[in-house]
């Protein structure tokens, strides 16, 4: 069935030589290429992770700065509104004081004019009363 002659060891030797040649010519360069490609992918993946971490840190920092800016702007707006309200309240108080002063001055003037009118009216009433009495009683009895 099988003949054991020199061809079998020769075929085994050829197989080993072919394996060594293929290993030297094909498998080692291919392995080196695959290893270098894996290293390249790993380094790119690490760089991508680092850049992603930096981007996330920057995003967090910008969000914090944005929050701080919003808080500061809200504080500035609140301060400006409070100041505007204070100024408006002062102006209103001043206007009310001026209105009250004008009202009091007008009331004094009205009271003064009323007193003058009453004095003039009393004088006229006295004069008219005297005239009426003179007409009724005569001018000699009224003096």
UniProtKB/Swiss-Prot annotation:
Membrane topology designation: Single-pass membrane protein
Pfam families from the UniProt entry: ATP-synt_B
Keyword annotations of the record: ATP synthesis, CF(0), Hydrogen ion transport, Ion transport, Membrane, Thylakoid, Transmembrane, Transmembrane helix, Transport
Gene3D superfamilies in the record: F1F0 ATP synthase subunit B, membrane domain (1.20.5.620)
InterPro entries: ATP_synth_b, ATP_synth_B-like_membr_sf, ATP_synth_b/b'su_bac/chlpt, ATP_synthase_B_chain
GO cellular component, one term: proton-transporting ATP synthase complex
Localization per record: Cellular thylakoid membrane
Bilayer-crossing regions: 6-26
Listed GO MF terms: proton-transporting ATP synthase activity, rotational mechanism; proton-transporting ATPase activity, rotational mechanism
Superkingdom field: Bacteria
Presence of the UniProt keyword Membrane in the record: yes
Xref: PANTHER family: ATP SYNTHASE SUBUNIT B', CHLOROPLASTIC
Family in the record: Belongs to the ATPase B chain family.
Subunit structure and binding partners: F-type ATPases have 2 components, F(1) - the catalytic core - and F(0) - the membrane proton channel. F(1) has five subunits: alpha(3), beta(3), gamma(1), delta(1), epsilon(1). F(0) has four main subunits: a(1), b(1), b'(1) and c(10-14). The alpha and beta chains form an alternating ring which encloses part of the gamma chain. F(1) is attached to F(0) by a central stalk formed by the gamma and epsilon chains, while a peripheral stalk is formed by the delta, b and b' chains.
Role noted for this protein: F(1)F(0) ATP synthase produces ATP from ADP in the presence of a proton or sodium gradient. F-type ATPases consist of two structural domains, F(1) containing the extramembraneous catalytic core and F(0) containing the membrane proton channel, linked together by a central stalk and a peripheral stalk. During catalysis, ATP synthesis in the catalytic domain of F(1) is coupled via a rotary mechanism of the central stalk subunits to proton translocation. Component of the F(0) channel, it forms part of the peripheral stalk, linking F(1) to F(0). The b'-subunit is a diverged and duplicated form of b found in plants and photosynthetic bacteria.
Protein name in UniProt: ATP synthase subunit b'
Source organism per UniProt: Gloeothece citriformis (strain PCC 7424)
Taxon lineage: Bacteria, Bacillati, Cyanobacteriota, Cyanophyceae, Oscillatoriophycideae
């Amino acid at each position: 069935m099988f003949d054991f002659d020199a061809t079998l060891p020769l075929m085994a030797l050829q197989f080993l030589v072919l394996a060594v040649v293929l290993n030297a010519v094909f498998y080692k360069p291919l392995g080196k290429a695959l290893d270098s490609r894996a290293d390249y992918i790993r380094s790119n993946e690490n760089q991508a992770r680092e850049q992603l971490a930096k981007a996330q840190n920057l995003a967090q920092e910008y969000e914090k700065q944005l929050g701080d800016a919003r808080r500061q702007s809200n504080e500035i707006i609140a301060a400006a509104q409070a100041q505007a309200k204070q100024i408006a309240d002062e102006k209103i108080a001043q206007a009310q004081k001026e209105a009250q002063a004008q009202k009091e001055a007008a009331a004094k003037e009205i009271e003064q004019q009323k007193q003058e009118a009453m004095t003039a009216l009393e004088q006229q009433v006295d004069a008219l009363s005297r005239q009426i009495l003179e007409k009724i009683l005569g001018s000699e009895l009224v003096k």
